[in-house]
Amino acid sequence: MNETLLKCTTRHVRIFTARVENNDLVPDPNQLTLDLDPDNEFLWTESVTKEIQQRFAELVASHAGGELSDYNLRRIGSELEGTIRKLLQAGKLSYNPECRVLNYSMGLPRTPELL
């Protein structure tokens, strides 16, 4: 019987109940895989990426033992979106000017001229 792949998709976060094998997603109810900013809207430093990964691990741990549902995955995804917004507002994360579509989905950049 095929396993069902649960997923959460937000603007900048995708979470799957799967593992990656040979660049393919293989359903796995015992593992969550995070795809961060698939459209490359932001410029990510290693430290900011680690901060998001750490927050993801904390959120997953806080839901350990609970039902693995679409709703809970969406809660984790929404929390990560909020973390991304905070990092952007704090100046730790910036928009990628080379992005395919520069739409400032999390608000206009905070620059001294705009404050």
Curated annotation (Swiss-Prot):
<keyword id="KW-0874">Quinone</keyword>
<keyword id="KW-0521">NADP</keyword>
<protein>
    <recommendedName>
        <fullName>NAD(P)H-quinone oxidoreductase subunit M</fullName>
        <ecNumber>7.1.1.-</ecNumber>
    </recommendedName>
</protein>
<comment type="function">
    <text>NDH-1 shuttles electrons from an unknown electron donor, via FMN and iron-sulfur (Fe-S) centers, to quinones in the respiratory and/or the photosynthetic chain. The immediate electron acceptor for the enzyme in this species is believed to be plastoquinone. Couples the redox reaction to proton translocation, and thus conserves the redox energy in a proton gradient. Cyanobacterial NDH-1 also plays a role in inorganic carbon-concentration.</text>
</comment>
<keyword id="KW-0472">Membrane</keyword>
<dbReference type="GO" id="GO:0048038">
    <property type="term" value="F:quinone binding"/>
</dbReference>
<comment type="similarity">
    <text>Belongs to the complex I NdhM subunit family.</text>
</comment>
<keyword id="KW-0813">Transport</keyword>
<dbReference type="GO" id="GO:0016655">
    <property type="term" value="F:oxidoreductase activity, acting on NAD(P)H, quinone or similar compound as acceptor"/>
</dbReference>
<keyword id="KW-0520">NAD</keyword>
<comment type="subunit">
    <text>NDH-1 can be composed of about 15 different subunits; different subcomplexes with different compositions have been identified which probably have different functions.</text>
</comment>
<dbReference type="InterPro" id="IPR018922">
    <property type="entry name" value="NdhM"/>
</dbReference>
<keyword id="KW-0618">Plastoquinone</keyword>
<keyword id="KW-0793">Thylakoid</keyword>
<dbReference type="Pfam" id="PF10664">
    <property type="entry name" value="NdhM"/>
</dbReference>
<keyword id="KW-1278">Translocase</keyword>
<dbReference type="GO" id="GO:0031676">
    <property type="term" value="C:plasma membrane-derived thylakoid membrane"/>
</dbReference>
